[in-house]
């Protein structure tokens, strides 16, 4: 069989139920439930040791399943040998055969096809991954990006019913990784490929995935589309992993806070005359409906964008969030009943200490001196309730 795309018309896809993988006393995968629909690309995202690769390897049959079920189209795969599962595998280093040319590498899994059909499939795969005419190239002459494209072509050539990719781009530099992530997404969509993809890189995950699953300590914390995951991280663990600042029950995505006006009397920057500075943006009722004060702790330049680490009052931030239209504690409580009293007065009445100043990151157009007082605005579109 030499289809140009994976046949997903009658498939129900991958089902993982209560999956556990153990290494001695270590529970690397701890009761994970996961569904991957036919034609869907699900990316598992997590730090090193989160269990994402162990989960993928268990699905592939490369790790023993301590508990739970792995099924394809409703049929258990737990006792099915690796080579009979019909799954394709691609790893970080590509694992190309250096003694074979590019065409022979891609044709490796096509031994059941006549020679002419093998050649046609190899050419088709090279076109798909953007390397037409590379059949006779020596593997040792390929760049890192070209080698990973060939590895992807080899994995796709037999039209696997499920493609498993374990950190396929992590050995490449960031610029190439960003380009290839976009290309991989296009290639998988074009072929209608069902895929489970593992990475520690958030940008890569958000580019490639239909849905992203965040893992920590062997557990799947959250699984959703990239858009909804950013809009509703769901927990402080997920929010922090995604790079959000967490202040109380608010998750602030990068860019949620911005410096919009320098307070009077801020020390001038080196080379400036005088001790006051101009506002970063005009503060008018139309452009600045609600703000809160903060103190700059440090400034840094990251990827061409100035950031200010600031100290602010979490209760003032919560009030600003409500002013900006985010649901307040009462609304978040919903049908579960009224929210517990909050605020300084409620804290004192309950014997709790009032909320202390906390740190967050704000975007700014220029560096600010440590100790400078600034005014911040909040972007509701980059802010979520937890």
For the regions a language model picked out, list residue spans one by one:
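Non-catalytic connector elements of ABC transporters
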Residues: 251-386
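ABC ATPase NBD coupling module
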Residues: 64, 75-88, 112-119, 229-233
């Amino acid at each position: 069989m030499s289809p140009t795309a994976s046949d997903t018309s009658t498939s129900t896809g991958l089902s993982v139920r209560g999956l556990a993988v153990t290494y001695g006393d270590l529970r690397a995968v701890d009761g994970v439930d996961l569904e991957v629909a036919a034609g869907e690309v699900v990316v598992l995202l997590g730090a090193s040791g989160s269990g994402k690769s162990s989960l993928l390897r268990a699905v592939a049959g490369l790790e023993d399943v301590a508990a739970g079920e792995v099924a394809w189209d409703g049929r258990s795969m737990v006792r099915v040998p690796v080579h009979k599962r019909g799954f394709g595998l691609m790893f970080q280093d590509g694992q190309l055969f250096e003694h074979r040319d590019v065409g022979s590498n891609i044709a490796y899994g096509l031994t059941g096809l006549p020679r002419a059909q093998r050649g046609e499939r190899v050419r088709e795969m090279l076109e798909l991954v953007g390397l037409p005419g590379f059949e006779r190239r020596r593997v040792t002459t390929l760049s890192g990006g070209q080698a990973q494209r060939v590895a992807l072509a080899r994995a796709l050539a037999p039209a696997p019913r499920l493609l498993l990719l374990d950190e396929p781009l992590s050995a490449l530099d960031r610029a190439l990784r960003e380009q290839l992530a976009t290309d991989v997404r296009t290639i998988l969509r074009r072929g209608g490929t069902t895929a489970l993809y593992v990475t520690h890189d958030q940008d890569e995950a958000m580019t490639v995935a239909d849905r992203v699953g965040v893992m920590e300590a062997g557990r799947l914390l959250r699984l959703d589309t990239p858009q909804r995951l950013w809009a509703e991280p769901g927990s402080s663990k997920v929010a922090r992993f995604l790079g959000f600042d967490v202040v109380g029950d608010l998750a602030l995505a990068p860019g949620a806070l911005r410096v919009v006006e320098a307070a009077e009397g801020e020390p001038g920057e080196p080379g400036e005359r005088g001790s006051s500075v101009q506002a970063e943006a005009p503060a008018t009722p139309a452009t600045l409906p609600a703000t809160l004060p903060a103190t700059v702790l440090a400034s840094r330049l990251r990827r061409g964008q100035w950031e200010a680490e600031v100290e602010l009052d979490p209760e003032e931030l919560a009030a600003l969030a409500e002013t900006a239209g985010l649901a307040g504690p009462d609304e978040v409580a919903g049908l579960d009943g009224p929210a517990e009293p909050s605020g300084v007065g409620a804290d004192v009445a309950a014997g709790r200490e009032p909320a202390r100043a906390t740190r967050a990151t704000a975007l700014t157009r220029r560096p600010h001196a440590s100790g400078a007082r600034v005014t911040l605005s909040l972007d509701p579109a980059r802010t979520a309730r937890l």
